[in-house]
């Protein structure tokens, strides 16, 4: 073992932390990797880019343009992070042949068979997202549309995706999280706020009326405060989302970029866990709005991880990443965010949370404050480097050398 790790192991032992146990447990935590970082949320079922209040900025060379390129890029990222992973797909990443093209309301499992083969190759489960944007029938309102033809089209899309999600679970043997997020809303002050939300509720009820195995598919609902072009009103608000999931017995999903900048998802996790058996998270980094910057090892990322671990409910929480940055190398963006979130989980697991809780309950807030600050200087980095070595992935910044080589040999050849 590395001497730095031996010293770190001894240091953490003084506060009752077994680093060997922590590394074993960290390797067993699945993090769902979002496919859309690799191609700027473009997908394969249309020629246009993302809409619905979603915006990818930058034009760094090397964007994946085909399923084969995207899969190759994901494989590179997987090789640079140790631990369990899942693959997070949007419905817009269906892979068609000339013979089986379909619109979104008639998508079938066969359109995702190549992704299943890819996931099986890497021992991963698949999470899924109906895509209610970047489509001719997604012009402002989808599941909340007053146009019955439009609304029913998107209901059929949701039902088709539910069947595909169950297919993923059956094929991989790992439960699938199917997340619903819609971009519905208005740029300016609406005349009627309750009508669209009532229609959204009706649409969700119709999707949920489809029989499915609740041990294999977990349906989640994601809210949002606003998006570009939807500044004044968002149908799927936080209050709607919370009320709906708790009344229907599905799973709340919180994206830490989908709230007002002064709201912290880290403070919401404990409350949601008291009222819901399961919880799903999209970890991102919001800069003044839902900008989906690459996840850094910043205060909120660390606090989210701390709340996940300290809750004692980590097995009840579905963890996923959600960001997209085209201003830097996309493989580096993917990898950095993934490794940063795993570092945050490691730091949380190396924290004597039980001791800190005891001090809080004793009213010894001075010692609690001091220890919370002092532990920030503990050598968690040496533990992370040892974890990487044991997982067979590069420690430290050496992973970026592999990304540079991949760019020079693979990405540079893309148009």
What are these regions (language model features)?
Residues 183-185, 224, 323:
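Short linear capping/connector segments at secondary-structure termini
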Residues 175-189:
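Aromatic- and glycine-enriched pocket-lining scaffold segments that form the walls
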Residues 110-119, 123, 145-161, 197-213, ...:
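Acidic, His- and aromatic-enriched active-site or binding-groove loops in soluble protein domains
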Residues 189-300:
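Acidic/histidine-rich catalytic cores of soluble enzymes
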Residues 1-146, 153, 162-164, 170, ...:
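Alpha/beta catalytic barrel-like cores
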């Amino acid at each position: 073992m590395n001497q730095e790790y031996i010293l770190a192991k001894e240091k953490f032992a003084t506060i009752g932390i077994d680093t060997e146990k922590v590394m074993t447990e960290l390797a067993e935590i699945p993090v769902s990797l979002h496919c859309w970082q690799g191609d700027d949320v473009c997908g394969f079922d249309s020629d246009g880019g993302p809409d619905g209040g979603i915006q990818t900025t930058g034009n760094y060379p090397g964007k994946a343009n085909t399923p084969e390129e995207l899969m190759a890029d994901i494989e590179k990222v997987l090789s640079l992070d140790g631990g369990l992973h899942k693959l997070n797909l949007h419905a817009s990443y269906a892979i068609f042949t000339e013979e089986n093209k379909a619109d979104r309301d008639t998508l079938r499992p066969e359109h995702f068979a190549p992704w299943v083969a890819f996931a099986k190759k890497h021992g991963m489960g698949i999470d899924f997202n109906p895509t209610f944007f970047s489509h001719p029938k997604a012009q402002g309102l989808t599941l909340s549309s007053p146009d019955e033809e439009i609304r029913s089209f998107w209901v059929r899309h949701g039902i088709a995706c539910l069947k595909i999600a169950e297919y993923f679970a059956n094929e991989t043997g790992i439960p699938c999280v199917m997340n619903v997020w819609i971009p519905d809303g208005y740029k300016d002050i609406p005349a009627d706020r309750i009508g669209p939300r009532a229609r959204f509720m009706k649409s969700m009820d119709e999707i949920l009326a489809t029989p499915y195995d609740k041990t294999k598919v977990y349906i989640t609902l994601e809210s949002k405060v606003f998006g570009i072009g939807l500044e004044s009103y968002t149908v799927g608000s936080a209050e709607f989302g919370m009320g709906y999931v708790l009344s229907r017995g599905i799973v709340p999903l919180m994206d830490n970029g989908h709230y007002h900048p002064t709201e912290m998802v880290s403070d919401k996790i404990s409350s949601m866990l008291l009222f819901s058996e399961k919880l799903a998270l999209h970890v991102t980094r919001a800069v003044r709005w839902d900008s989906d910057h690459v996840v850094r090892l910043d205060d909120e990322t660390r606090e989210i991880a701390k709340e996940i671990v300290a809750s004692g409910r980590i097995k009840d929480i579905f963890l996923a990443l959600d960001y997209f940055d085209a201003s830097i190398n996309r493989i580096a963006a993917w990898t950095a965010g993934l490794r940063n979130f795993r570092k945050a989980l490691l730091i949380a697991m190396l924290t004597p949370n039980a001791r800190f809780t005891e001090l809080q309950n004793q009213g010894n807030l001075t010692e609690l404050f001091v220890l919370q600050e002092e532990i920030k200087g503990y050598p968690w980095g040496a533990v992370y480097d040892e974890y990487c070595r044991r997982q067979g992935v590069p420690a430290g910044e050496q992973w970026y050398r592999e990304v540079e080589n991949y760019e020079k040999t693979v990405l540079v050849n893309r148009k």
